[in-house]
Amino acid sequence: MAYALPNLPYDYTALEPCISKSTLEFHHDKHHAAYVNNFNNAVAGTDLDNQSIEDVIKAVAGDASKAGIFNNAAQAWNHSFYWNCMKPGGGGQPSGALADKINADFGSFDAFVEAFKQAGATQFGSGWAWLVLDNGTLKVTKTGNAENPMTAGQTPLLTMDVWEHAYYLDYQNRRPDYIADFLGKLVNWDFVAANLAAA
């Protein structure tokens, strides 16, 4: 069962000026599409072909002989998740149960923000920053390259892509500025709250 490249949940210009139309076109239509195509080609005709992409990621994680499948599956999933983590006019602070949980587990929203900024800024090279639910507790973590916290039994709630292709056209080497805009102007807290409620 082929995994389909999802449409962006907003127009290519919707996240400007934080993320440009050019970045979204390259990132979604080229990078994300390539991961999806490579994944589908890699599993076609195998026993993984009829499994969900999440099950494939968990099944092949850590298997060096299936690194190509894992990398493309995880990157396809990570990007699909990432698009939904942003929205036009996003950012600010969450409310309701999510806000209460962040305050309980981090001490304050500001403490969460600092932890998330640190995770994104200190991820050496390519990777992702995440807010996850780990045995009932919210935690910030980071993963290199295509890695996904679901392989460690954690539930992803929010992610930020810190591969250079996510921000370089707009921010060049200023990753901290991209991170600040992501948190302050782009995060889709409704999506994060729904992920927490479903966990």
From Swiss-Prot:
PROSITE patterns, A to Z: SOD_MN
GO molecular function annotation: metal ion binding; superoxide dismutase activity
Residue numbers binding Fe cation: 27, 79, 161, 165
A Pfam family annotated for this UniProt entry: Sod_Fe_N
Swiss-Prot/TrEMBL catalytic activity: 2 superoxide + 2 H(+) = H2O2 + O2
Uppermost EC category: oxidoreductase
Entry's family note: Belongs to the iron/manganese superoxide dismutase family.
Function of the protein: Destroys superoxide anion radicals which are normally produced within the cells and which are toxic to biological systems.
Subunit annotation: Homodimer.
Listed name of the protein: Superoxide dismutase [Fe]
Gene behind the chain: sodB
